């Protein structure tokens, strides 16, 4: 798996998936145009897309195989983005 930038945000309050996603998208937008590829909630086990494969973290494998280059963690939520700058992948 390729190495990607990782940003961790620990809010001192509980947030919903929707709130955490807004935080993550706001942060990602500062790096360039991005697309959210996958998400995982370590507390409930929720993941999107709901893929099963590889014996590893399938949501991470899915995102990496589609060019993820930025992981943003907000509390227990993990968001994987592919960031592009001026039409090219960041890396």
Swiss-Prot record:
It comes from the Archaea. Pfam families: DUF5619. InterPro entries: DUF5619. Gene3D superfamilies: 3.30.1490.340. Signal peptide: none annotated. This is Uncharacterized protein AF_1514.
